[in-house]
Amino acid sequence: MSQPIPSASPALAALIERAVARVRHALPADAPWPEGVEHPLARVALASDFVVDTLARQPALLAHLAQPDPPPLPVPRLDPAQPQEWAAQLRRYRAAASARLVWRDVLGLDDVDATLAGATTLAETCLQCALQALEQQFSTRHGQVIAEDGSVQRLVVFGLGKLGGGELNFSSDVDLVYAYPQAGQSDGARPLAAEEYFARLGQQLARLLDETTADGFSHRVDLRLRPFGSAGRVALSFNGMDQYFQREGRDWERYAWLKARAVAGDIAAGEAWLETLRPFVYRRYLDFTALDGLRDMKAAITAEVAHHARLDDIKRGPGGIREIEFLAQSLQLIRGGREASLRERRLLPALQALVDLGQIDPPTGQALADAYRFLRRVENRLQMLRDAQTHALPQGEPERERIALGLGYAHWQALLEALAPHRTRVAAEFAELLAPRVHATAPDTLADYWRALPEGDAAPLLGIGLHDPNNAHHMLADFAQSSGVRALSDGARTRLDRVMPALLHAAIRATQPDAALRRVLGLLQATLRRTSYLALLDEQPSALARLVDVLSRSALLAERLAAYPLLLDELLDTRISGPLPDRAALHTACVDTLQIDDTEAALRELNERRLALSFRIALATLDGRQQPVDSTQQLAWLAEAVVQTVLQLARRELVAAHGQVPGGAFAIIGYGSLGGLELGFGSDLDLVFLYDHPREVEASDGKRPLEAGRWFARLAQKVMTLLGAETGAGRLYDIDVRLRPDGGKGALVSSLASYRDYQRDRAWTWEHQALVRARAVAGDAALCEAFVQVRRETLTRVRDPALLHEDVRKMRARMRSELDRSDAGRLDLKQGAGGLVDLEFLLQAGVLGQAAQHPALLLACATPALIDALVQVQWLPAESAAPLHHAHATLVEAGLSCTLDRRPRLVVSTPPIRDACQIVAAIADAQQLRFQPGKGA
């Protein structure tokens, strides 16, 4: 007697009893009944007639399943000499392997994720097994397809949908698309052109898997997702696929190919081709033009649910699996071009990536993941019952009882009560997705004015806040009849007509309305070719308002947005107002681009990330969410990470061409603002290059070796070239290497020994001053540490205080006379009296004079740290620390404010500025460093 199932009705208990008896009777007389198998078999019989049928047909399978942890079954070998047996072998294998999946699922050996993965692996195994046998058969009959370049061509089988995502349900069909890399002809006795060869091969593969025989079927095959659907060719070359997606590709196909994966045949070639398809699936910029197509798809889903009243369908019904998939994949399509983590085939990791990026809040993400797992588990059990491709909850009481008890619920109502909250939550989230547009509003007079342009006059612009309405009218009229506007499609022109009055209304309410309008028009002119940005402003009124606000307050950001519209994406990023990335996060964001093999593409991606991160820092500074001194430090960290990444790119290229110098080392030293962690927006980088290598090593070890010194010079030159190279996102940084030994007359790269000798014997005092702020920013750790030692040896030298102060004053006087742009009404924040350079010279003099006694001073490079260090050693009085910090912060803030609004760092000497400069000057005087008065003083 089998052990009864708790709560089972008498009829169900009898059904289970008969099922167990049927399996027992199917065993050969000499086959033992596995010990302890009766109870697990009864539980499985409750959940699946399919498993009972399979065990009745393959009774030897029971011993395999009765193991404590039944392993995968051996894959059948399809004998080329017996093709008539292939179908039966595949079907018996698929039935046995599927029975194992049910067994493990029902007995709790696998969770739903493992069951879905197992069903996927089974489908792939059958595909690969069948294709391998057919390829051998075709090769015998027709030979292999040979392309013009002599390469052998193989069929590529792409799996779409849940097969591609690795989430195949138990009794699912498989969505396949066939392709092949290149055209050609087979080389056998009965040759075929590649197109016919692979079409026949693909059709036979589908038939071998799909046809129902006395042994059932292996897998239902659906080929309708191929280009042109059922009317299209069975197999296309990669070139044909490319042409189709360039000319015919539609939004729903982007959605379908999001999960695509090469699952059989020439998998490597398939995955490589999918990389080329990525720009079709994921647009490079935030893709709000896709929203209309996605809304249409959502409306079709909603209409189908309403029309067919699919309340019991847990896949297509309200709150079902399809709604979760659509929710995740829609957000992936919109943002996946910018966020690599969203280019995920599997649904659950995609949901987590959306949570990590702030596109879904964590509770919602968890609720959707829980609902997805619950629904997929129920779906699998519905299909496991009789191996039927069903998604509908059963209507009959016996089936309901079996499903509920099999899932661990006492009765059907208990299962429904557990299911309902999941579906309700999913339906609510689906309803919110792609909600109807709420457009930005503007007075009707502005809408009428815009529609009338270029006709009409400036009258509607009078008295609404513009300082020069006539000039504004002329700008708007010129824009309205510009070639860019005239070239817009009807849809894009409709969007512009919706957006333009709202932009105009936002501009006139800005702090600088005329400047805001001028900058808005400049940005629109630059972005009209990319209608996705018009769609962004049309779809996101908050982004429109935010954009105009930023444009009105920052000429620099207005310029950058117009030059690099991808930065508009940052305005919509929910992380924009959150904590800024720390040093480690900045480093990770940059070095991740090294995963891109092509240097040009890696450089472009690196520059786009640098632009986005510096834009984020600029917004935080502009909004007052971060202190300017902290922003300059972050900009230096970002530059440091970029230099480290570029060095690796340069080294990668050089090693590939010439090998490496055995035992050699290279380091990049950051001077000036980079070294002092006080970099501005748009600052150049002061760099010095050092190298070292064993004396016995004379050259690199590649096929085209270079003399060691030349190799390092080539590396330094390549770093400079990459940092200054023009990409689609501009250049990374301008580089200044004049602080190297002997300046412009010296070698681009110095050996460690020559650098040490230069600093010891020939460097001027001002060069030692510069060394105070210098630090290693990239390169080999041992050489970076050796530089630290040279810096220590140089700066801890005992100096004559009087001579030191005289040298510092003379150099400051020279710089003042050559560089100070102050006049009677304005102060040069950097070079003026009491400005930032005076403060730097004060601190550098302190370090040079005190480091011999207090070497701990050398741990500091940044101005705030240097102030604290000099107070600590009592060179600066303790009471000067707070005033100096405040003065420094005031001057840095004023300087960044000028830079953000594209003004020279010449400011009217307001009381805060005047006080800051007086503090610096007074403390310098107290240290016998009375610097020459500034111009206009």
Swiss-Prot record:
Positions of the UniProt region annotated as Adenylyl removase: 1-436
Intrachain disulfide bonds: none
InterPro entries, per database record: GlnE, GlnE_rpt_dom, NT_sf, PII_UdlTrfase/GS_AdlTrfase
Pfam families: GlnD_UR_UTase, GlnE
Source species, domain of life: Bacteria
Cofactor: Mg(2+)
EC number assigned by the record: 2.7.7.89, 2.7.7.42
UniProt-listed SUPFAM superfamilies: Nucleotidyltransferase, Nucleotidyltransferase substrate binding subunit/domain
Cellular component aspect of the GO annotation: cytosol
Renumbered residue ranges of the record's region Adenylyl transferase: 443-937
GO molecular function: [glutamate-ammonia-ligase] adenylyltransferase activity; [glutamine synthetase]-adenylyl-L-tyrosine phosphorylase activity; ATP binding; magnesium ion binding
GO BP: any one term: regulation of glutamine family amino acid metabolic process
Database matches in PANTHER family: BIFUNCTIONAL GLUTAMINE SYNTHETASE ADENYLYLTRANSFERASE_ADENYLYL-REMOVING ENZYME, GLUTAMINE SYNTHETASE ADENYLYLTRANSFERASE
UniProt record similarity statement: Belongs to the GlnE family.
Full protein name: Bifunctional glutamine synthetase adenylyltransferase/adenylyl-removing enzyme
Organism: Xanthomonas campestris pv. campestris (strain ATCC 33913 / DSM 3586 / NCPPB 528 / LMG 568 / P 25)
Lineage: Bacteria, Pseudomonadati, Pseudomonadota, Gammaproteobacteria, Lysobacterales
